[in-house]
């Protein structure tokens, strides 16, 4: 009987540990993900829109949606980023972190998508948090063309970090 109890405890503990990945770090390959946009289209890191491009990913808590708007604006203004062939930026909204009902956020996301034409993916169940080991906050992540993490920052980026982010993107878009 004791062996059975120990076996059950070991299985439970190992499945709990497996459910929470270690936090993604610079230099590590990011596990692929599969998320939908507000239209129901499925995207992975290998989707045609992203394949072969350096990616800047804004993982957003919807209650702090404008936290890094200044970073998005700086990226849009930078004419040296090759958006046609080697660079793409997109948002992932962590709907589970929001305090309001999802329909409120989805409406705002739809308006932003129509205004900017950008890709905004929806994380309903902490998929990215669990897969990449992120915390429940806003993060900015840069993945190179091979999906190696080259930059990660948690929270609001100060001006020096915005410059560093852009420099990293430019460095890897030509490799």
Where are the regions that the model predicts?
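Short, internal strand/loop/helix patches
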Residues: 88-92, 103-136
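Thiol-/selenol-based redox modules, centered on thioredoxin-like
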Residues: 136-175
């Amino acid at each position: 009987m004791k062996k059975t109890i120990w076996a059950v405890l070991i299985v439970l503990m190992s499945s709990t540990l497996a459910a929470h990945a270690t936090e993604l770090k610079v230099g590590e390959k990011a596990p692929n993900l599969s998320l939908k946009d507000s239209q129901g289209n499925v995207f992975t890191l290998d989707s045609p829109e992203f394949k072969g491009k350096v990616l800047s990913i804004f993982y957003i808590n919807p209650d702090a949606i404008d936290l890094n708007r200044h970073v998005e604006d700086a990226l849009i203004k930078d004419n040296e980023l090759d958006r046609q062939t080697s660079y793409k930026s997109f948002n992932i909204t962590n709907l589970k972190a929001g305090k309001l009902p999802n329909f409120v956020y989805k409406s705002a996301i739809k308006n932003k998508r129509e205004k900017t034409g950008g890709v905004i993916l929806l994380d309903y169940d902490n998929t990215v948090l669990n897969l990449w080991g992120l915390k429940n906050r806003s993060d900015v992540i840069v993945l190179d063309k091979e999906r190696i993490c080259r930059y990660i920052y948690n929270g609001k980026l100060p001006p020096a970090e915005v410059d560093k982010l852009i420099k990293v993107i430019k460095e890897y878009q030509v490799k």
